[in-house]
Amino acid sequence: MAVLAALVCSSVAAADKPVNPIFVLNSLDASISVIDPVSFTELRRIPTGKEPHHLYLTPDEKSLIVANALSDSLTLIDPKTGEVQRTITKIIDPYHLRFSPDMKWFVTAANRLDHIDIYRWQPDDPITPMKLAGRVHAARTPSHLSIDSKSTTIYASMQDSDELMAIDLLTQKPRWKISIGKLPADVYLTPDDRLLLVGLTGDEYVEVYDVSQAVPKLIKRIQTGAGAHAFRSRGDGRHVFVSNRVANTISMIDIQTLSVVETYPAPGGPDCIDVLADGKTLLVSSRWARKLSIIDIDKKQVVRQVGVGRSPHGVWTLDHASRR
């Protein structure tokens, strides 16, 4: 029995061990740093279009899409090897991006040009895999996006007009738009689609809205730290991390109690976050330090920093916790 238990533990440990590369987007270098997930060393850099900011996995999980804002293009790479698969052009000013859960729609925020584009996802079309279906003119600087689990609603923050917008995905028209706190950035929708968390980069808290009704309602402001910015689920259905770029910290929020339960140091202007499958290791792009910071949640400290390119932004790995 002892031998069997040891084998089971060994198998579990092996399953939890990351095997796929970590990708960090270097926004000012037009490249992607490929990081070894075990040694945490940079293996190589992949060239992209100008200003790659965010990245997202295709519904079939065969491609990781990198949005190149200033090149009006998308770079598709293999999430397991980092090999470039293809480039899609004529995608106007893609800053942030999301796929709908029903795998029908691909949405981008045109940060510089003040609109949100909705594309029909056609993966079997080798010429036009994405066909523009609608364009919603936003206020000033649409920033981050989230889509509900039913694929009916897009939520978008307007960074420079301090607004939050909901868009009907089927009609491609706004449902509502409200004024919120200063410099809203990332938006995180809870798994039940009821609450929307908004990071306020111009303040030091996260605003929480009940979006389950026709009219959204502000129900709480969660004090996190100056420059509340980007979210990432821990993968346990209860906790979400938020980066506080000015405070140089990461806060862990309990989405049931809507309170901060832990805070971690994160030097260098923490921006985007990913969580390894163990649920205990954070990967954080340190925007101002040209580093990828590795944070051990149990130790509550940065245990490693990896040098990357200029202005590191999006960070992602196939071995992240929310896939469990």
Regions found by a protein language model. Give the residues of each.
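Bacterial N-terminal signal peptides
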Residues: 1-10
